[in-house]
Amino acid sequence: MPGTPNMTYKFTKAIIRKPNKSIHKALSSQHLNPSYEKILDIHKNYINCIEESGLKIILLDSLEDYPDSIFVEDPALIYKNNIIILNPSDLTRNGEAKIINSEINKYFENVFVVKHGTIEGGDILNINNHFIIGLSNRTNKLGAETLSNLLTSLGATVKICQTPKDILHFKSECSLIDDDVILVSNRMAKLDYLKSNYKLIELPIGEEGAANSLRINDKLLVPDGFIEAEEILTNKYNIIKINVNEIAKVDAGLSCMSLRW
């Protein structure tokens, strides 16, 4: 909760999946098709940046039958030494959850599975032992409450909020970047719960894409191409810019491509 030393962005390991050639079929609200070759370049740079941040990479094989499978954050959540398998909203992604369970459960002490409702990792913001779950088109009330009950039983506290309309995932336009400091878009800055409990750094209209940044240890990975965001963050943080244009075509951001702990 606010006011406590933050360990949320202190990591030693990351799970990442190799890109799949079928990614051009990934879910996209924009109906755009990313280039596999360009995704490969982004992915390579992403891994390099995470390794430079001091993390050991666990690299999973690509899954051609699952176009969205490179985005490993959605079907699973890590808390303490537990892995929680989530329940993605689109039926095409349910198989991903089962597969990633079999691939990574050996790295964790306990495995839990959310069986009721729909919930995706992109709607879950972790801040120490506190979680904010955003209701969205991908995460419904039953899924949020099911996960909330599970996390509470593991010692966490949870707040369920409504994601603003037309934002795909709660974290599409916000990210934890420091102790109790959340980087937000103009729309996310209006959420009463965030305003009341955290220090917000609000990005200007037009730079919403930079709000999904990724704090890893002493570095802050920031989507490239957002000039004002860079100016706001450069003096306060050790930023690394990463081109995410191609994954943005399928509504994805920096946090989507890894599970970190």
State each model region's role.
Residues P2-W261:
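The feature marks the mature, well-folded catalytic cores of soluble enzymes
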